[in-house]
Structure formats: structure tokens, C-alpha cells
UniProtKB/Swiss-Prot annotation:
Keyword Hydrolase: yes
Protein name listed in UniProt: Dual specificity protein phosphatase VP2
Organism: Chicken anemia virus (isolate Japan 82-2)
InterPro entries: HEV_TT_vir_Orf2/Gyrovir_Vp2_N (IPR004118)
Biased composition (Acidic residues): 172-187
Upper taxonomic lineage: Viruses, Viruses incertae sedis, Anelloviridae, Gyrovirus, Gyrovirus chickenanemia
Length: 216
């Protein structure tokens, strides 16, 4: 109790509670103003959608937390989001049930072993294999170009090998009369003589009747 009608006694001082006011349920206490300037504790505050937020967790015993629980809401939500992301990544490594939140309930808290599913790896890699063909075609051109430390890389012709494999696998049927392509292999001379009208037409000469192609 202060003497002199509520005035502090000589040599005394007011308590912090009577000087600053009773902490309220929200907002700054009486006699205090929340600012966005950097505090002596080396962290800043800002207003997000009307909510005061800081970039550092506030201790539970801090008067700021006691005045306004929204003071730490921004940090709390960010920490929850980071935790859920880590839960999802860790769950994907050990289980294949699809959602890690299922393990929070007792009726579906069992784990499904990923090693028992043989087709899982194939199902995961299938999109990569299909989509990788287009990327490989784009990279083949750049890979074949010369660089200061490498000569030009020429592609290997594979169509001849594929054609040989097809001929080896060919089986004559009754509709073909039991004939194969070797029965029709004859020496054909595709040489066009000098008196051919095609040559004259290409050279711009007067058109003449083309000579027939001679088959030897």
C-alpha cells in the first residue's frame, strides 16, 4: 500500500505491474506498443493478415507470449509444415500404404513391407523409362558434336543388323509358294545409258523417248 492517497512513498518506486498495467488477453499491455522494429534480442516482427508474427520462437515464459498467443503462430505453422513433410518422406521409405496419417489410428496402424511387392520398382521406374526416350533423342545430337577435348562421335548404323535379323527369322509360308527372297535375287543392271531420256531431261536437253531399263 502506498501512502499519501495512493502516491508512492518517499524513496520507493512503483511495481512493474502497476506501471505497465495488467496483461490483457490480446494485444500489447497497457502502456506498451508493439512495433515492427528490430528488438534487442536480434529478431524482427511483422504483421501478416493482421497477426503479429516473428521470425524466432518465443519462450513460454516471455510476457509477449502471455499477452498474445498469435505472437508465435507464424513460426508454429511453419514448424508443423516442416514436420509433416519429414513424416511423408520417412514414411515413403518404409511403407507403401499411401498415407502416413493412417498410422495415427489403431485400426490401420500396420506396416506394409515394400520388399514383398516385386512390381513396385517396375511401376516406379516405368514413367522414367518412357519419358527418358525423348530426352535421350535430344541429348544424342549434343553428345555427337565435337568439343575441345573430344572428337565428333558418329552414330553406329544399326538398320543393316536389324534387316539381317529379320531375314534370318523369315519363314516362307504356303501362300508364298514356299519361296524365299533368295529365289528372286538376280543380277539387275540399273545403269542408265547415255541415250536415256531421263538424263536428257535432267540436263535440260530436248526430251527424247526414254530407253527401257535393261535387265541382264
Amino acid at each position: 500500500m502506498h501512502g499519501n492517497g495512493g502516491q508512492p512513498a518517499a524513496g520507493g518506486s512503483e511495481s512493474a505491474l502497476s506501471r505497465e498495467g495488467q496483461p490483457g488477453p490480446s494485444g500489447a499491455a497497457q502502456g506498451q506498443v508493439i512495433s515492427n522494429e528490430r528488438s534487442p534480442r536480434r529478431y524482427s516482427t511483422r504483421t501478416i493478415n493482421g497477426v503479429q508474427a516473428t521470425n524466432k520462437f518465443t519462450a513460454v515464459g516471455n510476457p509477449s507470449l502471455q499477452r498474445d498467443p498469435d505472437w508465435y503462430r507464424w513460426n508454429y505453422n511453419h514448424s508443423i509444415a516442416v514436420w509433416l513433410r519429414e513424416c511423408s518422406r520417412s514414411h515413403a521409405k518404409i511403407c507403401n500404404c499411401g498415407q502416413f496419417r493412417k498410422h495415427w489410428f489403431q485400426e490401420c496402424a500396420g506396416l506394409e513391407d515394400r520388399s514383398t511387392q516385386a512390381s513396385l520398382e517396375e511401376a516406379i521406374l516405368r514413367p522414367l523409362r518412357v519419358q527418358g526416350k525423348r530426352a535421350k533423342r535430344k541429348l544424342d545430337y549434343h553428345y555427337s558434336q565435337p568439343t575441345p577435348n573430344r572428337k565428333k562421335v558418329y552414330k553406329t548404323v544399326r538398320w543393316k543388323d536389324e534387316l539381317a535379323d529379320r531375314e534370318a527369322d523369315f519363314t516362307p509360308s504356303e501362300e508364298d509358294g514356299g519361296t524365299t527372297s533368295s529365289d528372286f535375287d538376280e543380277d539387275i543392271n540399273f545403269d542408265i545409258g547415255g541415250d536415256s531420256g531421263i538424263v536428257d531431261e535432267l540436263l535440260g536437253r530436248p526430251f527424247t523417248t526414254p530407253a527401257p531399263v535393261r535387265i541382264v
